Amino acid sequence: KGQTVLFHAAAGGVGQIFCQWAKSLGCKVIGTVGSDEKIKLAKKYGCNEVINYNKENFKDKVLKLTNNEGLPVVYDGVGKNTLENSLGCLKMRGTMVSFGNASGKLDPVDVGKLIAPKGLYLTRPSIAHYTSTREELDEASNKLFEMVKSGSVKVEIFKKYSLKDASIAHQDLEGRKILGPAIITP
């Protein structure tokens, strides 16, 4: 509550859910997107500020928005292209949550150069770290469904693909053509 956070790929499916949820908890959300088309979408789903990382340096913009203080946490599902600048957005003892590779596999992190100077925390969680039992998975799922049911989180399907078009869906995902949740149906 009351924190400002950065979420990369804010207009994507995970981003849309995260940004709404964070805003409902009282956070100020800064989101990044890769096109002007996605700015409006990210704002619709809870971002207070949106940065097109193809037009401006998101680290510089975040530092400007925070009066050079930096952020307590960054959530990054993009990966390779954003990791180093994301670490630069963090304030002293900030936390970097790296959970995806949309731009490619992460390079090794130079702990002495990128982590140690500010005493940062870097984590790379997967769903298995939070839902190791069926009960934990059910509990986490129920929390999401409660947020959807209450209207705090709205989920709109961006596109439906038939199973025979699964390869097209994958290409669209890799090409960043998907603006929100997409599903494949039989």
Predicted segment positions?
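Terminal helix/beta-alpha structural elements that buttress the NAD(P)+-binding lobe
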Residues: 1-186
